[in-house]
């Protein structure tokens, strides 16, 4: 509801969320997922299951770039309410991921907040040749109200990940807050706000 979405392989400025929406209200719906079969993925940023209820928030952002950029994942300058609802996942099949930044299962209820970001940047500083980091903003800014829902996850099978920064299970209910950032690079700290 008035939220972001999913982006990958992006360069330059990247903004996902709600900006200067005045008195608008951003309401997301409930999410219900039931799986019975096996799921297997390969490659970077290849999550097995991603279940999100996002109201005025972010989404999922996967970046693999050699360019500098700014990332804003969340809501900004909204006088209305940002509300997400319940997320339910019932998984009965084995999930296997074989790439970096590839969780087996992510469940998030986000109201005016952030989301999940996987970042792999290669921008270097001309002065010392070391990697530099872009400004990152993950979360809600100046939102009037932010409410997130409940999350229920029932897992009856194996969750296997083989890559770096690839949790088997990530569960978050976020109201006007942050989210999750994963980076594989030996980069120096930039501006990170939650």
Task: Give the label of every model feature segment.
Residues 1-194:
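Low-complexity, glycine- and small/polar-enriched segments
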